[in-house]
Curated annotation (Swiss-Prot):
CDD domains: CcO_II_C (cd13912)
GO cellular component, one term: respiratory chain complex IV
TM region positions: 15-45, 60-87
Mitochondrial intermembrane side: 1-14, 88-227
Protein name: Cytochrome c oxidase subunit 2
Gene Ontology molecular functions: copper ion binding; cytochrome-c oxidase activity
Cofactor dependence: Cu cation
Family membership: Belongs to the cytochrome c oxidase subunit 2 family.
Organism: Hylomyscus parvus (Little wood mouse)
Note on cofactor: Binds a dinuclear copper A center per subunit.
Amino acid sequence: MAYPFQLGLQDASSPIMEELINFHDHTLMIVFLISSLVLYIISLMLTTKLTHTSTMDAQEVETIWTILPAVILILIALPSLRILYMMDEINNPVLTVKTMGHQWYWSYEYTDYEDLCFDSYMVPTDDLKPGELRLLEVDNRVVLPMELPIRMLISSEDVLHSWAVPSLGLKTDAIPGRLNQATVTSNRPGLFYGQCSEICGSNHSFMPIVLEMVPLKHFENWSASMI
């Protein structure tokens, strides 16, 4: 989860987030190298006579600065397309959970079970227990089995929302009248926090998301107790 004055991304807890962090580092290195080269050339132009005012045509130079950026863009695009494909691909999910955005709370329905549905509201600051996080704790957590592919179906009852859990690499728009889907897979147990990431009204900041990833046996016991 996030912590004060954090500069980097949250620790990856899913295969998708691991790939996103690797892609971020890959792209950042390319940007750093290009920026360093440009600054070096600018410094040479300012401190030396690295100019040719009489040059009217430089076919070789124009070819280089056309082909080289194209190659760089391809090096950035290929891993990006790979991750997009991974995020859209859902193979044999063991569980499907439908989540609906409301002003200003989330509702969840486990479609593989009968009558397993609930609303999830933020816990007010005055009702927090020791150890619970302000503006992030909810009264009903979404309990899911870890290390298994889970399909999330996401929509909205009223306005645009966005269901996001950064440490799992998840951010999917909740659009009225449209059903979007995302894959949830966690490498480890724990609590994973997120929030609505689309400005949806005056209480937009009070729509937290809490996923509790547990071993399959614990999930089966929890689901049996909820039905």
